[in-house]
Amino acid sequence: MLSFIQYTLGIMSSLGNGNNQHNINSNTGSSQNSAAEGTMERGSCILVRYASQNSLDESSQKQLPRSNGKEKTTGAYRNNIHTQRSFEAMNMMREQNLLCDVVLVAEGIEIPAHKMVLASCSPYFYAMFTGFEESRQDRITLQGVDPRALQLLIEYVYRAVVEVTEDNVQILLTAANLLQLTDVRDACCDYLQTQLDPSNCLGIRDFADIHGCIDLLNYAETYIEQHFSEVVQFDEFLNLTSDQVAHLIKSDRLSVPTEEKVYECVITWIQYDVNGRQHHLAELMEHVRLPLLSQDYLVQYVEKEQLMKGDLQCKDYIIEALKYHLLKGEQKTCFKTPRTIPRQPVGLPKVLLVIGGQAPKAIRSVECYDLREEKWYQVAEMPTRRCRAGLAVLGDKVYAVGGFNGSLRVKTVDVYDPVLDQWTTSHNMEARRSTLGVAVLNNCIYAVGGFDGSTGLSSAEMFDPKRQEWRLIASMSTRRSSVGVGVVNGLLYAVGGYDGASRQCLASVERYNPSTDTWTQIAEMSARRSGAGVGVLDNILYAVGGHDGPLVRKSVEAYDPATNTWRAVGDMAFCRRNAGVVAHNGMLYVVGGDDGLSNLASVEVYSPESDSWRILPSSMSIGRSYAGVAMIDKPLUSEQQGARVATKQSYASHHPTGTIYSRYANCAALQQAQNEAAAGQAAGFGNDDENSQAEGLNPEPANSNNSAPNGNNVHYENIYESIEQFAPLNGGNGGNGGAHAGIPAGSNPLQYAVLNQPQPGPSGLGPGQAHRSLGGERGAVGGGGGGGGAVGGGCIPPPPPSMLHSMQQLYHPMAYRNELYDRTAGYDVPRGRPAPSYYQNQPPTGPSANGRCPNLHLDLNRVRYPSGASAQQQQRTPRQRSFDDTESYHYYRCQNQSNGTAKYDNLYERVREEPAYQNTGSFAPAANRAAGLFGRFDVIGHGVGRIERHLSSSCGNIDHYSLGGHYAVLGHSHLGTMGHIRLNQSNSSSASSASPYGANGPATTSQPNPTKDSSSVNVKSFLSCLGGENSQSMNNLNKSSAAHGTASGSAPAANGNEATLPGSISGGASGGGAGGAGSSGGNGGQGSSIMGGLASAAAVGVNGTGASTSTTLGGKSTGAIPKISRKSKQSQQQGPSDPTAGTSAPQSLAGGNGLPPVDVSLGAPADPMYANGCGGRVTKPSLQWLLVNKWLPLWVGQTPPDYKFIDFNFMFSRNCDGCSSAGGSHGQQQQQPQELVRYGTIDQADYIPPAREYPTMTGSYPRVLRNTPQLARLREHEYENVPLNDPPPGRGLRGIASPLQVGRARSESPSRPPGSDPLRTWAFDFENNTFRPARSPALATSSGLAINREKPREVRRITDGTFGARDLAQPDTEKPGPSGLASKLALLKQPEPDKEDGRLSSASSSSDSDNFAIESLAAESSGGQPDEEEEEEGGSTRSGVGRRDDGGRVVGNSTEKENVGSSSNETSDSLNYDGPASADRSLSEDEVEAARPDNTASE
């Protein structure tokens, strides 16, 4: 066999002779023969190879150019990737086991390698292969090395890449340290530094100490000292040795709020193993600085500790501490021991604190940026909204001075304590100031310039913390609003700003000398800057950004006091004005601001050494302009301080017995709430949320497992507010008690709930008898009920007894807080089994211990229906799914209904994919699934501020509304409660008797209705498609007229008689429907109700012959929704009606007066158009009108306990595919059990399967709640109020749930006390979201009589979950086309009646923001001078009327100038309000604010 060299020799010699292919082949053979014979020498081979290759290279170079275009190199040649290619080739050979000369073995795993490669990268292998016995071995076994780590390290040697993960970091660091691969070891140490947390830092420190990782060891020790309070809560601390504990607690650098934490951790460590550790107590207490404890703590806790009493040395330490407290003043300084020296932590991490600002409205939220961890987190909110304030850090407190709260310029001062994570108030300034400058000089706070709401200020004042007072100092020479201030060398500088007198942005700068109390002019900046940020680095003053009218700057100037000159430095990445600036560690941080178009959430950092800017990797959660910025020490346990402090305060003030009842929800854990619920009730501590006490007191604990059952318990959810549970105070019911046990007449409504006793029901109430002790006069019980008895509709709790008012202040909101108003509150989030989980709050172990409250987001998906016997069953009750079963179905898998538990997620639970929208219930074992609940839907909505996002219903059906905490059902229920609100394509001429509505009141004659009638109310639109009954919705909509109803049920058990319930909608409906249904074998009585101006068709009793009729009370306010209906020519004869004054309803059931003929036996209207479900669409202005004028008053009380206002919650059905099939023409011939209607069954021939079905965790398929043929046949209303004992066919839940569970699922609709519409006489307070009584202007009617009726109000769409109303004569809709400034000015005038139809002129906008924005220009129309703050930013001037172009900007009639001004909510920029700026002046923030369409800040 030829060798490789011989084979190559023959080829090269043939190529060198230059012969053809034939000769080459022959020569090759001869060469091989020659080589074989040994006739050719080695030297000639080399020569031949060289000659042949040289000839090839020369010929190819002459004919072909260089393909890569590189220049020919001369001299030394260097290939930068040669080493990389070489190692890649060697790694490939290693993987193929080529030329490997050593095999490394670890735990039986063999890894081939090359000695030369290993020795070149590792000193360990270099020594092994050069001077030891292993150099002559080809198989080496490594002891104590993990084979996975060895494989990774060998690959790193060849590839220079290794991935460090949580799984391999420990073995990798150990092996790298042994093999002396220091770079890999350092990479592992860096990774461990990033993974440090209080639960593992002690172990990582020991690990670093063992392996000699000095940097990691020091870093871990610093971390432990800075997070000592958190570290001692974990098991690693309890497993330390006594020497390790002593080494830790003797450090002077421990960061602890008080020495109590050190003392408590020592006691805890001893108690972990008392017998084995008690003898270490004295040596550990030597390092505890007991003299630094408070005297009360020493006496109450330390001296009484049994461990301390049993040790003589510890007693000496206590005596020493008490002596220290007896010393006076300077005597303490002479008493020097190691235990009297305070700890001095160093190197505390810094956080960037951002307070308030505009986003786009004035907000309360406060964010912190951790510079080390590079992440943002929320801390306690300010007490009130605040922007344009000044911020100062004095001592360890942060002062927010002055500013703007959304309506007023304020002079108040709020103080933030980072340690306690709470806000307090301080002394007010002498003057109101917004856009002021604030700085700290000589331990005093200076407030300079600003704007007081009418003029710019040149005055300044100083706050002396020793005297706790503000006093005026010398005034500046120029008025300056939006001024920046800074302190250099003990002097205060006021930089730029805006002068309202000259209406110019300023370039001038003044300097204040506190020793002489004088201001001096210094060199001006090179550019005019208003709203510039000012910071100081190394005695250099920096002016950052700002604007000159509409021109927003990104340039920066620096002032050197030594030379009195300004110079330009590097520009920022973005144009910014009104940004916060703070200096830290030689860097300048610029936070937020706006670029003239939108608010900015980014943060830029300036380095003076490189004269460059960089952007922080993490941005704020929202863009903020006019925010206050400060750099402070990182608060200890920032997320938990609020809970800890609140726990201590509550502990001291509320429960001397030792049980902690916190005023903050994030202090109470689930277990704590369960264990203390009974004790809290017995002590008189309830659970009502202090932020939303809208419906009276509630002593029923939210988390109690042993609460007394209450059949009529109304449970409701509200995303943004707390859950209001008034269950123990609702009305009783007729019948024999059962699961719906009521409270005996004349008894204290709180007696049984507070004492946690069962609630006995009244014995043997007669048929249809009202339970007057609680609900008899507030909501009528359906008359004519048979033996079963009908549940009273409309029961609400009575006013709380006077004795409970004192208890109200001590109520304990265990789980639910108002996220809008209290972001410091945490929320229990029970998830899975067992109840304690990561997201759940952990209770503190003592009055000074820290509870773990890591979850600060809202999750109301918790225990509401505790129905099981075990705690596991009571952790979670399933949430039922809404109509849109195709949405998020697979994501939240459902349990099969047939197994006893239905886990349905809500319609919009995945809107934002937050826990508050998710069904996170645990899946109970099969044996416990019978505890599942099947009742009403849990409706989660989004609040008024988000209404526009749900107006996408294809048929305009409104499904469910949770109004102010009460659960109201309106529209398409698919559960038999009622039909949806119907919109007719055309109206017949027979419906022309509806009262037209003019500008001054109801008209006396009918007028033709124009084609585009956007506000007429058709009575037929509100008749239910399910049997013509809409009592449930009308009961919710018209409580004001139904509140004064009384019950008069007198039907016998056999055949019910008519029950007349004046003014009560629910009673009348229940009288004919539910009352008849309640009879057992008898015939239901006939009920009637006066429905406040709204007629209802007859409803048939399910098991009887009675019917419910309704008459009208003309002129009463109803719940009618104004709609846009497509009119036919015949319908133009019908006069329009008043959306606010109600309609005149027909008096007959024969089809006249606007009602179609009704078949009483079937309970369905005979109008084929109506029966077929031809519908239009509920317009946004109409829905807006309904919210403000109808639903809002129903849930706003008229007594002081009800002042608190709760957000609306609602949602819409996106697709109602059963509207046409659910028409009244189907009648009620076929009765189906409710379970078949809701879920269907496999054996039902007409069951329509869902569009998508997914198996549950048990492998079965759930029955999705979906429109089925059975739903179309269900005609009765008020399903929730049917009798429980012996229900009629089609209404029971046989085989699905127990009566108790059904009772808990009921959704009562409480009535209101008699009285006028609160919204007509009350005004909305924007600051605290409450209603206050207000005067109503007198408006003349057509007859000349004055009536008190306020102008229509409008809900404004905002993003913070609140809403306001303005007293504007706002039309229901806007005309098509762009809305201009002129049209908005016209809104300030009283609208003229439409001569054509006698109604108010209306306009409609296609944009949601226009529909829900308050169109107010009161400030500009007043004729006064514009605000100076707003003038400076280039808003609309009085030189011309602006208009809004296609892009949303406002431009002038003759002049257009693009405004790149502020995007704040009080300024024009949040709506891109770009008005024309005059050439001689610019607009300030507050002047633009007065001219904004949605201005709510005018004073």
Swiss-Prot record:
List, alphabetically, the InterPro entries matched.
BACK (IPR011705), BTB/POZ_dom (IPR000210), Kelch-typ_b-propeller (IPR015915), Kelch_1 (IPR006652), SKP1/BTB/POZ_sf (IPR011333)
Main subcellular location of this protein, as a coarse class: cytoplasm
Kelch repeats mapped onto the chain? 351-396, 397-443, 444-490, 492-539, 541-586, 588-634
Extract the coiled-coil ranges from the record: none
Comp. bias regions, Low complexity: 698-713, 986-1003, 1040-1054, 1107-1119, 1401-1410
Instruction: Tell me the compartments it is located in.
Output: Cytoplasm, Cytoskeleton
Q: Which residues form the signal peptide?
A: none
Q: Supply the alphabetized keyword list.
A: Actin-binding, Cytoplasm, Cytoskeleton, Kelch repeat, Repeat, Selenocysteine
Q: Which GO terms describe its cellular component?
A: cytoplasm; cytoskeleton
Q: What is this protein called?
A: Ring canal kelch homolog
**Taxonomically, what lineage is the organism?**
Eukaryota, Metazoa, Ecdysozoa, Arthropoda, Hexapoda
The gene designation is kel
